[in-house]
Design a protein with these regions (language model features):
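Amphipathic alpha-helical interaction surfaces
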Residues: 36-39, 57, 71-82, 99-107, ...
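Glycine-rich, aromatic-bearing surface loops/beta-hairpins
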Residues: 125-191
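A charged, amphipathic interaction segment
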Residues: 87-147
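Short, charged, amphipathic alpha-helical segments
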Residues: 49-50, 88-91, 164
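Short amphipathic alpha-helical coiled-coil/interface segments
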Residues: 51, 69-72, 94-97, 121, ...
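A structural motif
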Residues: 14, 56, 64, 73-77, ...
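N-terminal interaction modules that seed assembly of large macromolecular complexes
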Residues: 13-84
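Short, Lys/Arg-enriched N-terminal segments with co-localized hydrophobic residues
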Residues: 1-11
Length: 191
């Protein structure tokens, strides 16, 4: 299952590791980094004081992490996502996952993935009905749901049994997709 425990600790290094190991967790993690940057009003000095310094990193790592945040802040400003939305690098990652999702669904070799999607579809339909926003694709709906629940949990809020069931099923689908993504990236997935 896709389970993410968020922390500001060693964010750049965690992001790099997640990108290699679990692309679904990476995407959720990067969405949280975007929100952390917004919470500090895209102010690198405030981020350095409140996020980077408390980590107690050596000077070289602290500098690298600061530069990483600076580059993300610059991208957010250039792309106009200072208040909401996602960086193009994160939208590209989602796009890659959507492309793989479609390829898996169109192949007879990955019936178990299709079966997992069909188990998840009722939750996706329900989430879309509750969403009230412009309709988004199946995977983005899943990621939005997981991210929303993660934020609720971070703030100590309870979630209903129905929501917990939805998140469990969505997590299974995204974990399977993340596994296929890793295989595809390593040229070990055949269509």
């Amino acid at each position: 299952a896709v389970i993410v425990h968020f922390s500001s600790y060693r964010t750049m290094y965690i992001a790099s590791r997640k990108h290699k190991e679990n692309i679904a967790e990476y995407l959720l993690y990067m969405w949280q980094i975007e929100d952390i940057i917004r919470a500090y009003n895209l102010d690198i000095d405030h981020i350095e004081e409140s996020v980077i310094r408390p980590m107690g990193l050596d000077e070289e790592r602290a500098h690298a992490l600061r530069e990483w945040y600076v580059s993300l802040i610059d991208m957010m400003r250039c792309e106009g996502v200072e208040r909401s939305g996602h960086l193009q690098i994160n939208r590209n990652t989602l796009g890659q996952l959507v492309d793989l999702h479609r390829r898996l669904l169109s192949s007879d070799k990955y019936a178990e993935y299709s079966a997992q999607l069909y188990k998840t579809l009722p939750f996706i339909v329900e989430l879309r009905a509750k969403g009230g926003k412009a309709p988004v694709g199946e995977l983005e709906t899943c990621f939005n749901a997981l991210y929303g629940v993660l934020m609720l949990r971070l703030h100590g809020r309870e979630i209903s049994k129905g929501t917990a069931d939805a998140v469990a099923q969505i997590s299974k689908l995204l974990a399977m997709l993340a596994g296929y993504y890793k295989l595809d990236r390593d040229d070990k997935l055949e269509f």
